């Protein structure tokens, strides 16, 4: 996993599905990131690279994308996503979490806008909720798996060319992948889902200390 094996959106998608999880940036597990698996020559060029591949990979529909590990971006295969949701949600759909008083009110405001829209760019949410801490709410909802990044939207010039950094578009995982899939592991104990995720990563990075994996995904 330490070779420069990711050279396109297709190979990125393939590795994310194979491993089950693929962080975008370097982390505590050596070699376990797009940053390390993609040649330096493909970053920040005039041609599409890892930054620009995010949208196409998400749109393929094989992987979810969001800030899932330590508030950092990760691709998660649809095979592993139900286990991540089961573990992070700990038996709570969002409404149930609200009923038990476990949700910050601003998180609920953000979630409701995203859920009701079916998919909305972050800039539009910012306009509806004027709060300097809104990025914190986006991140917390992603870490809890109640929202995911559904695409990246780019500005276009008069001649139709895209430019600048892509703006994240958010949706609920249920609206993107279906509630049946997302909740398919709800009968599994969250601790069992966690163990399945740990073992999956160790399968591909066996030299990694188990505790390191636990700390990364906990």
For each feature predicted by the language model, list its residue ranges.
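Long, low-complexity intrinsically disordered regions
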Residues: 1-218
């Amino acid at each position: 996993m330490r070779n420069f094996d990711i050279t396109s959106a297709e190979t990125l998608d393939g590795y994310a599905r194979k491993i089950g999880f693929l962080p975008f940036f370097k982390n505590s597990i050596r070699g376990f990131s797009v940053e390390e698996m993609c040649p330096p020559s493909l970053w920040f060029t005039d041609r599409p690279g890892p930054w620009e591949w995010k949208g196409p990979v998400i749109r393929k529909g094989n992987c979810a994308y969001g800030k899932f590990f330590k508030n950092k971006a990760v691709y998660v295969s649809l095979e592993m996503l139900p286990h991540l949701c089961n573990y992070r949600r700990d038996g709570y759909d969002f409404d149930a979490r609200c009923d038990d008083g476990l949700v910050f009110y601003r998180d609920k405001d953000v979630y409701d806008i995203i859920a009701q829209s079916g998919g909305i760019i972050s800039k539009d949410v910012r306009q509806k909720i004027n709060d300097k801490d809104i990025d914190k709410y986006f991140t917390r909802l992603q870490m809890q798996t109640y929202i995911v990044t559904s695409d990246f939207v780019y500005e276009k010039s008069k001649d139709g060319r895209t430019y600048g950094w892509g703006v994240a578009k958010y949706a609920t995982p249920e609206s993107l992948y279906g509630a049946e899939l997302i909740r398919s592991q709800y009968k599994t104990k969250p601790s069992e889902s966690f163990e399945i995720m740990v073992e999956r990563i160790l399968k591909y990075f066996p030299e990694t200390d188990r505790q390191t994996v636990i700390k990364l995904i906990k």
